[in-house]
C-alpha cells in the first residue's frame, strides 16, 4: 500500500513538468528515451540489448530494389510471389490500374453476394425461400419478392452506374501515352505497359504515370515544378529537385539509355510526404528523399522537359495505396435503430410462437373434429403448430420493414445535398462551398456535446504578418515604442528605398530601419540575414517580380519580412543560396540543411560564407532553442521577457540563433552526416542524432513575432454554440500565454472565469484519487456511490493545461525504465505473476485517473490544451468519447489535425492555408469556422428531427399495418391467414405509404433557419435524445398496436350483422379486406399530415396523391379484364366496385379513420397547451418573432465600450475587435427562459410601434 501511495503523481520543485516543453514525439523510441539520463541497467538486459543490436545490423528497411533500364532484373525468380497454389506473380505491380469491382460475368453474382451479406436482405431472402414451401406459406411469393427485388434493383443499378464510370476512367487512364526508353531510344507506349525500372520523359502539363525518381530537368538547378491537386487538393505549385550528378549527366537520350543506376528504397506505402532510399551509381551512393520523387497523379507545370526512373508502378504507387477504404463511421441513431429492429424480430418470433401454440391447441380442440377442414393429411396438432409458426413468420414479416434502410439512405443523401447547396455556407472570396463528404452522419450533427478545435487556421485566419521582433534584447515593431527612441512618427514605414520590397508589409517602427541602414548594431543585420537564408522557401520570378513558395505561412512571412527590410532571398541551387544584402548580391555555399519537422521544432542551415568561414543558422520554438544555447548568452532573460510580451498579445514566436563552426569540427561532423544520409535503416533517427551533435552552444540573436488574426464571426459562433450547451475545447501547439489570450479574444474565457492550470488540476486529482483509494474505489474499479463535483455549483471555471502536464496527469509519460525492466529471457512464474499484478494495478489506476480528469474537465465551461502533439489531440478526444459517451466533433485545417478529425465521431475540415489534408480526412468541410453554427444548429438539428420523425412514423405505420393479421388470427383458428389482399401487402410499403414519409424526412422543419440560430437552446433535444429513444420507440409501437385494433375491430363489428341497400350482406372476406385496407391507407397518410410541421405543395400532393394512387390501383386490380389475363394472381374481381358503392362501407371507413386520428389530435392539443416544448413556444409566437426581426433590422444598434483586459493586445488594427475581446460577457451565463425572451422582445416591439 505504501508503494502504491508513493507511486501517485506528485512533484518536487525539480521534477515538475515544464509548461513550455513540447511533450515527447509520437515516434520517440525507447532508446532515445534511455539517452535522456543515466540509469542502473541489469546485466542480463545489457546482454540482451547487445544481441538485439547485432541482429539489427542485418536488418534493412530498404528492401525494394530497382535497376534502371533492366526489365529482366525485376523478373528474377526471387522477386516472384505465390498468389494461388502454383500461380505466381511478380512482386512489382504492372502500371495498369483497376479500380472497378465487376465485369460482365461477375456483376450479377458478386453484387447479389455483397447485398445478401447485409442482414436485412438475407433475412428477406430466407422468407422468400419459406414462402416457396406450400405447407408453410399462406402468402403469394410475390408479396416478398417484389419489394425485395425493388430494394436489390435500386442498389444494383446504383452500383452498376458507379462501376461503369470506374471502367471508363480506368480505360482512359491506362491508355494514356508516355515516352519510355526502349531499345536505346524513346518510344511512345501506353501507361499500362510501363514497368518498374523504365526511364521516362515527361513534358509540360503531362500527368505523371507512376512514382518516379527525378533524374534531370530542363529548368536551371535541376528544379521541376509539379501540381499536386489530385493528391492533396493543393493548387499551389511544389518544387522537386534532382540529384546534382544525375541532372548533370542524364540530359541527353544516349546517356539516359545507358543509365544503369541501382536503387534500394522502402517498400511501397501510403506516406505521401516520406521517402527513404539510396541511389548506387558510379561506385558512389546518394541519399534519396521525398523532394526527389515525383508522384503519380501530379502534373508537370512550368517545366519544359524532365526525365525520371520508375520506382513504384500501378497499385504500388502512393496515390493508389491511399485509395483504400476509410474507417466507416456510424451514428448513434444507427446503433439505436439496429437494436430496435432486433427488438422487433424478437417480438415477431414471440408473437409467431404464441399464435403457433394457439393453432396447435385449436387443432386439438376444434380442427380435428371439423370434417369440412380435413385436408387429406393426418398431421398431429404439434406438427401443424410448427408449420404455422413459420407461416406466421411470413405473414407478420412486415413488422421488420424491408425498405427502412433504403429509405434512410435516400433521406441522408438528400440532406447531404442540402448542405452542399447552402449558399449561406459558401465562401465567395475563395469560391469554396460547404461540402458533405459523407452521407451517413447528418443527423448526428444535431447531437454534438463537445467540439474539439484547432487554433491556427481554424479559429484564426492563418495569414501570417510580421509584426514585431526582439533583437539583442530590444523590442521593435510597435509605433508606441517610437518615443523610446526619440521618435514621434506613427505613420507606416516607407520601404521605397528597397527595390525588392513588396509594398504589402505594414510596419510602424522607423527606428529599426535606421538601425539596419546605419549598421550601428551588427546583430540587427545578422537577424534579418538569418531570416533570408535559413529556410526551405523556393523562389520564382513572375513578370520580373520575386514570388516565394513556402512550406508554411510562418516561413513565408519571415522570408518576406527579411526581403522588405533589405535582405532579399534571390535564388538557390542544391549547393548555393543567393541573397541581396542591402542591394549587394552575395552567394553562399550550402553545406547542409537540417530540416524542420514537428518533433525537432526547429531547422538549421550550415553555410560557407564568401570569406570562407562556416556558420550554422538556426530558428525554432523557444523551448527547443533555449535548451541548446551557450551558457554565455547575456540576452536570454531579456528575450524571454519579450517572448512573454509577444505571447500576451497572441503573437506567434520563433527564436533565432547562430554559431561559428571550425573547419575541423565540420569535417568530422560531415562524415557522420553523410553516413546517416545513406543509412539503410532508421535513417530519420540517425539524422536526428547527428543534428543534435552540431546544434548546441548556440548564440541567441532574438525572436520574431507574427500576427495571425481571428477569423470573422468566431466569438459570435462560440457564444451561440455555448448557448446550445455545446462545450468547446481548444487543442493547440502554441504557447500557454498565446492560447490563453486567444481564449479571451474568442470569448471562451471571460473576466469572471476562474482558470485552473496544470498544478491545480494535479492537486485536485491527487485528492480525489486518495479519497477513492480510501473507499476502495481504484482496486474495485468502481466510482464513488454518488458523483461528487470537483467545484462548487454555479462557478464559471476554465481549464488550461499543457502537453507536458497532460502526460503527467494521465500517466501517459514514457519512462526510460520501461525497456530496462523488460527482460528478454523467461522469468520465473512468481516474477510473471508479480509483474502481471503490478501492470494490472497500474492500468486500473491510470484508467481511474483518466476518468477523473475527464469528469473534472467536463465541469469546466472551457478547456484549452496547449503545447500538445497530434497524438495528444486524438487522445483527448478519445478520452471524452470513452468516459462520457458523448458525441464529439473535431475541427481543424492542417495535417496535424487529421488524427483528431478521424478519432472524433464527426470530423470537420477547414479549407485554409495549410493544404487540404484535413479536408480530405474529414466528413464535412467549409472555408470558415463561423459556418459551424449553421451546420450544427440548422442542418444538424433539422436532420436529427427529420430522421427521428421518419423512424417513429415508419415503425408506427408498419405495426398498424401488420398487427391487423394478429387480431384476425383470433377468428380464423390461428391459421396464418392474411387480412388483406396479397397485392395490397406487396405495394403498401412500396407505393401507398412511402412517398409522404420520405418527403417529411427530407423537407420538414419545426422552425425556420433564422429562428434556429436565434434560439440555440432548441438544439438540446438532440443532445438529450428526446425525440428518438426506446421510450419513443415503444410509444410508436403502442400507437401502431392501438391503430391496428381500431382498423380491425370497427370494420369487424360493422360487418357482423349488416345488410346493404340491395338486401345482401356485404360481410364477405374480400369486402372486409378492402374496407380495412382503405381505412389503413387514409389513416396513415393523414397521420403523417398531423406529424408535418412545414407544409409545402409537394407534401400535400404526396399525401393525397398516395391515397388516390391506392384507389386507382385497387380498382384496376379488381377489374374483370386483369382477372381474365391472370386469374390466379388477381382474385378480388369486382370487390372494390361492389363494396365501395355501399354508403355503409364509407361510413365505416370514415368512422375508423376518425377513431384512429381524433385521440391523436386531442393529445397533441393538450400537450402543446399544457406542456409545450421550446419549439412549440416559438411556433406559437412565430409571426411576432418575424415582425420583431424585421423591426430590429431597421434599427441602428450601438454598443458601449469596455476596458481591455490586455492593454498591449495586438490582434487587429481594425476598429471593432476591442469590444469582442474585452466585453467581459460570460458565455456561460444562465439563459433566460424562452417565454421571457419572447415576452421581452414583444413588449419592446410594441413600445416602439406605439411611440
UniProtKB/Swiss-Prot annotation:
GO molecular function, one term: cardiolipin binding
Keyword Transport annotated: no
Residues annotated to bind Mg(2+): 454, 456, 893, 897
Keyword Transmembrane helix: yes
Keywords carried by this UniProt record: ATP-binding, Cell membrane, Cell projection, Endoplasmic reticulum, Glycoprotein, Golgi apparatus, Magnesium, Membrane, Metal-binding, Nucleotide-binding, Translocase, Transmembrane, Transmembrane helix
Necessary cofactors: Mg(2+)
Ranges that cross the membrane: 122-142, 145-165, 340-360, 386-406, 953-973, 983-1003, 1033-1053, 1072-1092, 1095-1115, 1143-1163
Biased composition (Basic and acidic residues): 43-52
Topological category with respect to the lipid bilayer: Multi-pass membrane protein
Domain of life of the organism encoding this protein: Eukaryota
GO CC annotation terms, alphabetical: apical plasma membrane; brush border membrane; endoplasmic reticulum; Golgi apparatus; phospholipid-translocating ATPase complex; plasma membrane; stereocilium; trans-Golgi network
Compartment list: Cell membrane; Apical cell membrane; Cell projection, Stereocilium; Endoplasmic reticulum
EC number in record: 7.6.2.1
Bias (Acidic residues) ranges: 25-35
Pfam families in the record: Cation_ATPase (PF13246), E1-E2_ATPase (PF00122), PhoLip_ATPase_C (PF16212), PhoLip_ATPase_N (PF16209)
GO biological process, one term: aminophospholipid transport
Binding residues for ATP: 454-456, 555, 596, 619, 652, 732-734, 867, 873, 896-897
UniProt topological domain (Extracellular) ranges: 143-144, 361-385, 974-982, 1054-1071, 1116-1142
InterPro entries, per the entry: ATPase_P-typ_cyto_dom_N, ATPase_P-typ_P_site, ATPase_P-typ_TM_dom_sf, ATPase_P-typ_transduc_dom_A_sf, HAD-like_sf, HAD_sf, P-type_ATPase_IV, P-type_ATPase_N
PROSITE patterns with a match to the protein in the record: ATPASE_E1_E2
Catalytic activity: ATP + H2O + phospholipidSide 1 = ADP + phosphate + phospholipidSide 2; a 1,2-diacyl-sn-glycero-3-phosphocholine(out) + ATP + H2O = a 1,2-diacyl-sn-glycero-3-phosphocholine(in) + ADP + phosphate + H(+); a 1,2-diacyl-sn-glycero-3-phospho-L-serine(out) + ATP + H2O = a 1,2-diacyl-sn-glycero-3-phospho-L-serine(in) + ADP + phosphate + H(+)
Record-stated family: Belongs to the cation transport ATPase (P-type) (TC 3.A.3) family. Type IV subfamily.
Function, as annotated: Catalytic component of a P4-ATPase flippase complex which catalyzes the hydrolysis of ATP coupled to the transport of phospholipids, in particular phosphatidylcholines (PC), from the outer to the inner leaflet of the plasma membrane. May participate in the establishment of the canalicular membrane integrity by ensuring asymmetric distribution of phospholipids in the canicular membrane. Thus may have a role in the regulation of bile acids transport into the canaliculus, uptake of bile acids from intestinal contents into intestinal mucosa or both and protect hepatocytes from bile salts.
Subunit structure: Component of a P4-ATPase flippase complex which consists of a catalytic alpha subunit ATP8B1 and an accessory beta subunit TMEM30A. The flippase ATP8B1:TMEM30A complex can form an intermediate phosphoenzyme in vitro. Also interacts with beta subunit TMEM30B.
Name of protein: Phospholipid-transporting ATPase IC
Record lineage: Eukaryota, Metazoa, Chordata, Craniata, Vertebrata
Amino acid at each position: 500500500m505504501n508503494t502504491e501511495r508513493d507511486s501517485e503523481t506528485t512533484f518536487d520543485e525539480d521534477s515538475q513538468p515544464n509548461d513550455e516543453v513540447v511533450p515527447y514525439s509520437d515516434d520517440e523510441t525507447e532508446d532515445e528515451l534511455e539517452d535522456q539520463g543515466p540509469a542502473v541497467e541489469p546485466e542480463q538486459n545489457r546482454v540482451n540489448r547487445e544481441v538485439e543490436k547485432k541482429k539489427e545490423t542485418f536488418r534493412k528497411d530498404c528492401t525494394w530494389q530497382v535497376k534502371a533500364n533492366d526489365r529482366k532484373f525485376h523478373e528474377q525468380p526471387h522477386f516472384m510471389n505465390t498468389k494461388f497454389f502454383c500461380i505466381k506473380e511478380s512482386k512489382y505491380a504492372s502500371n495498369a490500374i483497376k479500380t472497378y469491382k465487376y465485369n460482365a460475368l461477375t456483376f450479377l453474382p458478386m453484387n447479389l453476394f455483397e447485398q445478401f451479406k447485409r442482414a436485412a436482405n438475407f433475412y428477406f431472402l430466407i422468407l422468400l425461400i419459406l414462402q416457396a414451401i406450400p405447407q408453410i406459406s399462406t402468402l403469394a411469393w410475390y408479396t416478398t419478392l417484389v419489394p425485395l427485388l425493388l430494394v436489390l434493383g435500386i442498389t444494383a443499378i446504383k452500383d452498376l452506374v458507379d462501376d461503369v464510370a470506374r471502367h471508363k476512367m480506368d480505360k482512359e487512364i491506362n491508355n494514356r501515352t508516355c515516352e519510355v526508353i526502349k531499345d536505346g531510344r524513346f518510344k511512345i507506349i501506353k501507361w499500362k505497359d510501363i514497368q518498374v525500372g523504365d526511364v521516362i520523359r515527361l513534358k509540360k502539363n503531362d500527368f505523371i504515370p507512376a512514382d518516379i525518381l527525378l533524374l534531370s530537368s530542363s529548368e536551371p538547378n535541376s528544379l521541376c515544378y509539379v501540381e499536386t491537386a489530385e493528391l492533396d487538393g493543393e493548387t499551389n505549385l511544389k518544387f522537386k529537385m534532382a540529384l546534382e550528378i544525375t541532372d548533370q549527366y542524364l540530359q541527353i537520350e544516349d546517356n539516359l539509355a545507358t543509365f544503369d543506376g541501382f536503387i534500394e528504397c522502402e517498400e511501397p506505402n501510403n506516406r505521401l510526404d516520406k521517402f527513404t532510399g539510396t541511389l548506387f551509381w558510379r561506385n558512389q551512393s546518394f541519399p534519396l528523399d521525398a523532394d526527389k520523387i515525383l508522384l503519380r497523379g501530379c502534373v508537370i507545370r512550368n517545366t519544359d522537359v524532365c526525365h525520371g526512373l520508375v520506382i513504384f508502378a500501378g497499385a504500388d504507387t502512393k496515390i493508389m495505396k491511399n485509395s483504400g477504404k476509410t474507417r466507416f463511421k456510424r451514428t448513434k441513431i444507427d446503433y439505436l435503430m439496429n437494436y430496435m429492429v432486433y427488438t422487433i424480430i424478437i417480438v415477431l418470433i414471440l408473437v409467431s410462437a404464441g399464435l403457433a401454440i394457439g393453432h396447435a391447441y385449436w387443432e386439438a380442440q376444434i380442427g380435428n373434429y371439423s370434417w369440412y377442414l380435413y385436408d387429406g393429411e393426418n398431421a398431429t396438432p404439434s406438427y401443424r403448430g410448427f408449420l404455422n409458426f413459420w407461416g406466421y413468420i411470413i405473414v407478420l414479416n412486415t413488422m421488420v420493414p424491408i425498405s427502412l434502410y433504403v429509405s434512410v439512405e435516400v433521406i441522408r443523401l438528400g440532406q447531404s445535398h442540402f448542405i452542399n447547396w447552402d449558399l449561406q455556407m459558401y465562401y465567395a472570396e475563395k469560391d469554396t462551398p460547404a461540402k458533405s463528404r459523407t452521407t451517413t452522419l447528418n443527423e448526428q450533427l444535431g447531437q454534438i456535446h463537445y467540439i474539439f478545435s484547432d487554433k491556427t487556421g481554424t479559429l484564426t485566419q492563418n495569414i501570417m504578418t510580421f509584426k514585431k521582433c526582439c533583437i539583442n534584447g530590444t523590442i521593435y515593431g510597435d509605433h508606441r515604442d517610437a518615443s523610446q527612441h526619440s521618435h514621434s512618427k506613427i505613420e507606416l514605414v516607407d520601404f521605397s528605398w528597397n527595390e525588392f520590397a513588396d509594398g504589402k508589409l505594414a510596419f510602424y517602427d522607423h527606428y529599426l530601419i535606421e538601425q539596419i541602414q546605419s549598421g550601428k548594431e551588427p546583430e540587427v543585420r545578422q537577424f534579418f540575414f538569418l531570416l533570408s537564408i535559413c529556410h526551405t522557401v523556393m523562389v520564382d520570378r513572375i513578370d520580373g517580380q520575386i514570388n516565394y513558395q513556402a512550406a508554411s505561412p510562418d516561413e513565408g512571412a519571415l522570408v518576406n519580412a527579411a526581403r522588405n527590410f533589405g535582405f532579399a532571398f534571390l535564388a538557390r541551387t542544391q549547393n548555393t543560396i543567393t541573397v541581396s544584402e542591402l542591394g549587394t548580391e552575395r552567394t553562399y555555399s550550402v553545406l547542409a540543411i537540417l530540416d524542420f519537422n514537428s518533433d525537432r521544432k526547429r531547422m538549421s542551415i550550415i553555410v560557407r560564407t564568401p570569406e570562407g568561414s562556416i556558420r550554422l543558422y538556426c530558428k525554432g520554438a523557444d523551448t527547443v532553442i533555449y535548451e541548446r544555447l551557450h551558457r554565455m548568452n547575456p540576452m536570454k532573460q531579456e528575450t524571454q521577457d519579450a517572448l512573454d510580451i509577444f505571447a500576451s498579445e497572441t503573437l506567434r514566436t520563433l527564436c533565432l540563433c547562430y554559431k561559428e563552426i571550425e573547419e575541423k569540427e565540420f569535417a568530422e561532423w560531415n562524415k557522420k552526416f553523410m553516413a546517416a544520409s545513406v543509412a539503410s535503416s532508421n535513417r530519420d533517427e540517425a539524422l536526428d542524432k547527428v543534428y543534435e551533435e552540431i546544434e548546441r552552444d548556440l548564440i541567441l540573436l532574438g525572436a520574431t513575432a507574427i500576427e495571425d488574426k481571428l477569423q470573422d464571426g468566431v466569438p459570435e459562433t462560440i457564444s451561440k454554440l455555448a448557448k446550445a450547451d455545446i462545450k468547446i475545447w481548444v487543442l493547440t501547439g502554441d504557447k500557454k500565454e498565446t492560447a490563453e489570450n486567444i481564449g479571451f479574444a474568442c470569448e471562451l474565457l471571460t473576466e469572471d472565469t476562474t482558470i485552473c492550470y496544470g498544478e491545480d488540476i494535479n492537486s485536485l486529482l491527487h485528492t480525489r484519487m486518495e479519497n477513492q483509494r480510501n473507499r476502495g474505489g481504484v482496486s474495485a474499479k468502481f466510482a464513488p456511490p454518488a458523483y461528487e463535483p470537483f467545484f462548487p455549483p454555479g462557478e464559471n471555471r476554465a481549464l488550461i493545461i499543457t502537453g507536458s502536464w497532460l502526460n503527467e496527469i494521465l500517466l501517459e509519460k514514457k519512462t526510460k525504465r520501461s525497456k530496462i525492466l523488460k527482460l528478454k529471457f523467461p522469468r520465473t512464474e512468481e516474477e510473471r505473476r508479480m509483474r502481471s499484478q503490478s501492470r494490472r494495478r497500474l492500468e486500473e489506476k491510470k484508467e481511474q485517473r483518466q476518468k477523473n480528469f475527464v469528469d473534472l474537465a467536463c465541469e469546466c465551461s472551457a478547456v484549452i490544451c496547449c503545447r500538445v502533439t497530434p497524438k495528444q489531440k486524438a487522445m483527448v478526444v478519445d478520452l471524452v468519447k470513452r468516459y462520457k459517451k458523448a458525441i464529439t466533433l473535431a475541427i481543424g485545417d492542417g495535417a496535424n489535425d487529421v488524427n483528431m478529425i478521424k478519432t472524433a465521431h464527426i470530423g470537420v475540415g477547414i479549407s485554409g492555408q495549410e493544404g487540404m489534408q484535413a479536408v480530405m480526412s474529414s466528413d464535412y468541410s467549409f472555408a470558415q469556422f463561423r459556418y459551424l453554427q449553421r451546420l450544427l444548429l440548422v442542418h444538424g438539428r433539422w436532420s436529427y428531427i427529420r430522421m427521428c420523425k421518419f423512424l417513429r412514423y415508419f415503425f408506427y405505420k408498419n405495426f398498424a399495418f401488420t398487427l391487423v393479421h394478429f387480431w384476425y388470427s383470433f377468428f380464423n383458428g390461428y391459421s396464418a391467414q392474411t387480412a388483406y389482399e396479397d397485392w395490397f401487402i406487396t405495394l403498401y410499403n412500396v407505393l401507398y405509404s412511402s412517398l409522404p414519409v420520405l418527403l417529411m424526412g427530407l423537407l420538414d422543419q419545426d422552425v425556420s433557419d433564422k429562428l434556429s440560430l436565434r434560439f440555440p437552446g432548441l438544439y438540446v433535444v438532440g443532445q438529450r435524445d428526446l425525440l428518438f429513444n426506446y421510450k419513443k420507440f415503444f410509444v410508436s409501437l403502442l400507437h401502431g398496436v392501438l391503430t391496428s385494433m381500431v382498423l380491425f375491430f370497427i370494420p369487424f363489428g360493422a360487418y357482423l350483422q349488416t345488410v346493404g341497400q340491395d338486401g345482401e350482406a356485404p360481410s364477405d372476406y374480400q369486402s372486409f379486406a378492402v374496407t380495412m385496407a382503405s381505412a389503413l391507407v387514409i389513416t396513415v397518410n393523414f397521420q403523417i399530415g398531423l406529424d408535418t410541421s412545414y407544409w409545402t405543395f409537394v407534401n400535400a400532393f404526396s399525401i393525397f396523391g398516395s391515397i388516390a394512387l391506392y384507389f386507382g390501383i385497387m380498382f384496376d386490380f379488381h377489374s374483370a379484364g386483369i382477372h381474365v389475363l391472370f386469374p390466379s394472381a388477381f382474385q378480388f374481381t369486382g370487390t372494390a366496385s361492389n363494396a365501395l358503392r355501399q354508403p355503409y362501407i364509407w361510413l365505416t371507413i370514415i368512422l375508423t379513420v376518425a377513431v384512429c386520428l381524433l385521440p391523436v389530435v386531442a393529445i397533441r392539443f393538450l400537450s402543446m397547451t399544457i406542456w409545450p416544448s421550446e419549439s412549440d413556444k416559438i411556433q406559437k409566437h412565430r409571426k411576432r418573432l418575424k415582425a420583431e426581426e424585421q423591426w430590429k433590422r431597421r434599427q441602428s444598434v450601438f454598443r458601449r465600450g469596455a476596458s481591455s483586459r490586455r492593454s498591449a493586445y495586438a490582434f487587429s488594427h481594425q476598429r471593432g475587435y476591442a469590444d469582442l475581446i474585452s466585453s467581459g460577457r460570460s458565455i456561460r451565463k444562465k439563459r433566460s427562459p424562452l417565454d421571457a425572451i419572447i415576452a421581452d422582445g414583444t413588449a419592446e416591439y410594441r413600445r416602439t410601434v406605439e411611440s
